[in-house]
Amino acid sequence: MSERVSEEPGLDKGDGAEECELDDPELKAIRMRVREMEEEAERLKGLSGQDKSIGVSPRPCMKLIHSKMTAGEYTEGPPRPLSAEEKKEIDKRSVYVGNVDYGGTAQDLEAHFSSCGSINRITILCDKFSGHPKGYAYIEFAERNSVDAAVTMDETVFRGRTIKVLPKRTNMPGISSTDRGGFRGRPRGNRGNYQRGQRPRGRPFRGCGRPGPLNHPY
């Protein structure tokens, strides 16, 4: 007995299989997920190119928490490069604050030193690997006389810890801060007023008369 298969004109077997695949909800979900992953990859790729174009610094060892440019206005981000003279001028208006509580913020430090004068910038130093605060900070004031007022805050209590406040030093490249110069005492091994390896001028003094017999103690 022969079996007939009736087919409608214009309908191919391949077309029917494709239509069934499109109607499969699981296949639709997989395709939608793949499309979302591709869009996410393109978005991340675009963000990576944007970071390279603006030159984001990868070093978090010195993190500028807050920079107060004007009254009530704060900006975040790395400071702009400064010349040597500008750094000297800023250091003369800045103080070092040690033993700072790790949970202390720039706002906390500003409130603690607000009586000393107007503050331009507060920098909290962080570890370059972990990003955690190192426990000290620098505060830049608008006026030099504010440094003297801030030094009087030495050994005050900040967030339960006694802090250390000192004027900020200017580190000059190639010059050691421990080299104070000046006289350092008599050099070792000095035998006369001539350097090692040089013979004294003239004949050495040997006394008068003939030498007597040598008396050995033993």
Curated annotation (Swiss-Prot):
Keywords: Cytoplasm, RNA-binding. Residues 93-170 form the RRM domain. It holds the Pfam family RRM_1. Disulfide bonds: none annotated. Residues 1-26, 169-218 are annotated as: Disordered. Gene3D superfamilies: 3.30.70.330. It is found in: Cytoplasm. GO terms for molecular function: identical protein binding; poly(A) binding. Residues 205-218 have a biased composition (Low complexity). One of its GO terms (cellular component) is cytoplasm. One of its GO terms (biological process) is nuclear-transcribed mRNA catabolic process, deadenylation-dependent decay. Binds the poly(A) tail of mRNA. Unable to interact with the cap-binding complex and is therefore unlikely to be involved in translation initiation. PANTHER family: EMBRYONIC POLYADENYLATE-BINDING PROTEIN 2 (PTHR23236:SF27), EUKARYOTIC TRANSLATION INITIATION FACTOR 4B/4H (PTHR23236). This is Embryonic polyadenylate-binding protein 2-A. It comes from Xenopus laevis. The lineage of its organism: Eukaryota, Metazoa, Chordata, Craniata, Vertebrata. The gene is Pabpn1l-a.
